[in-house]
Curated annotation (Swiss-Prot):
Protein name per UniProt: Protein PHLOEM PROTEIN 2-LIKE A2
Coiled-coil regions listed in the entry: none
Keywords tagged on the record: Membrane, Transmembrane, Transmembrane helix
Residue stretches spanning the membrane: 49-71
Tissues in which the protein is found: Vascular tissues, specifically in phloem companion cell-sieve element complexes.
One MF annotation (Gene Ontology) recorded for this entry: carbohydrate binding
Organism: Arabidopsis thaliana
Keyword Transmembrane helix: yes
Length: 194
C-alpha cells in the first residue's frame, strides 16, 4: 500500500468526435498532444495516472490518498480508495476555442456501489479569463451508481478580446475530514453547448 501527499501528473487530450470516426488533426504540445476538429470540443484523459487535465494537472489530497488504476474500454482511469481531502485543479488555454461560441465544462465521474464518505457536497468551480467565477455544489452521493455521469462545472463564452486567456476548473471537497472512497474520475470535457 502506497501513501502519497501531492502529485502532479502529465496527461493528454482526445477530441470528443474521435469516437465518431471524424478525421482529426493532432498537434504535439510538450508531454501531451492536442487533437482538433471543426467543432473544437475537447475531452481530457490522463495517460497513466488518476485524474485528468490538459497538460499538467494537480491533485492535492490533504494528508494522504491511495488510488488504484482502473482500465475502461477507451482509457485508463483511477479509482479513489481512501481520500480525506479532495482538490482537483486544471487549466486550459482559450485560444484553442472559437470566439463567441458557448462552451460547457463537465467532469466525467462514476461512483461505484461500495463508495463511502460522500455525505458532503463537492464544489465544482470554473474561473474565466475575465476573473468571473462560476461555482456549484453537487451531492455526488446521490449519483446513479456504476454509471459514467457528467457533472457540469459551468458554461462560458469567450469574447475575441479574451481569446488568449485561460479558464481554470476544479473539483473540491476540503471542508470535511471524512475518509472517502469509490469515486472514479474519467475526465474533464470542454465542448460546444448546443
Amino acid at each position: 500500500m502506497r501513501v502519497k501527499r501531492r502529485k502532479t501528473v502529465s496527461c493528454c487530450t482526445r477530441e470528443i468526435s474521435q469516437l465518431h470516426g471524424q478525421s482529426l488533426k493532432q498537434i504535439n504540445i510538450g508531454v501531451g498532444s492536442l487533437i482538433l476538429t471543426k467543432h473544437q470540443g475537447y475531452e481530457f484523459y490522463c495517460k497513466k495516472v488518476t485524474f485528468v487535465f490538459f497538460c499538467f494537472f494537480k491533485i492535492s489530497l490533504n494528508s494522504a490518498y491511495l488510488y488504484t488504476l482502473y482500465s475502461d474500454v477507451r482509457t485508463e482511469v483511477a479509482k479513489m480508495e481512501r481520500v480525506a481531502w479532495l482538490e482537483v485543479v486544471g487549466k486550459f488555454e482559450t485560444e484553442k476555442l472559437t470566439p463567441n461560441s458557448l462552451y460547457e465544462v463537465v467532469f466525467v465521474v462514476k461512483l461505484i456501489d461500495s463508495a463511502k464518505g460522500w455525505d458532503f457536497r463537492v464544489n465544482f468551480k470554473l474561473v474565466l479569463p475575465t476573473g468571473e467565477t462560476k461555482e456549484r455544489r453537487e451531492n455526488v452521493n446521490l449519483l446513479e451508481r456504476n454509471k459514467w455521469v457528467e457533472i457540469p462545472a459551468g458554461e462560458f463564452m469567450i469574447s475575441p478580446e479574451h481569446l488568449s486567456g485561460k479558464i481554470e476548473f476544479s473539483m473540491l471537497e476540503v471542508k470535511s475530514d471524512q475518509w472517502k472512497s469509490g469515486l472514479i474520475v474519467k475526465g474533464v470535457a470542454i465542448r460546444p453547448k448546443n
